[in-house]
Amino acid sequence: MTMLAVARLAKRLGSARRPGGFVPMNLLYQDLTTMAWWVPPARRHIWFRCTGGELGAHERGESVPHPGLVFAAASDKTWRVWAVKGCDRPSEATPLFQAPYFNVYGTGAICQGNVDVPTGGFAGSVADRIEAWNKAFFDSFFTHPNTQGPLVNYKGGPYRFWRDMLDGRHAVFPESALVPLGTSLAQVLDRRGPDGG
């Protein structure tokens, strides 16, 4: 290849559109295949579809307080969620808790049974991708506990907990109900990978 050809190629490659964009404040971690983000505690709508009517109806939804959450999504559609305490943005040392939701395994893996998982891999802006994953989670129906261990520390268990939440018995999310996992954000993202196991 001549020097002129190298210069032309370099100019064309240099003018090609580069991926990028503003980094949202809630993005916690990103590499070539995984991104993790924080969703601050807030009041959000949640939907349940339980065949036994354990929550007072076969299908029920209400706006309830939620804890802070850390989600991790990978390009292979691996998708996980953990809970965190407090309102501060998580750091590497932040302890993680079992996400108190039905359809979430003890590893944080989210059962994708009725969920419209975002398509397009990691295309689009980071903010758009985060919004798509959040929408997929909060717009789905939660149907049954999936974890082998305790989902919540709550008298009466997970069905009683969510029935009380849906009935408006807690003005703020009761963080005392969160089950500690004995691991930190850095441990699940760095040492063991985004799958937490």
Residue ranges and their predicted role:
Residues M1-G121:
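Compact alpha/beta protein-protein interaction domains typified by the UBC
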Residues E92-G197:
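Domain-scale recognition of soluble eukaryotic interaction modules
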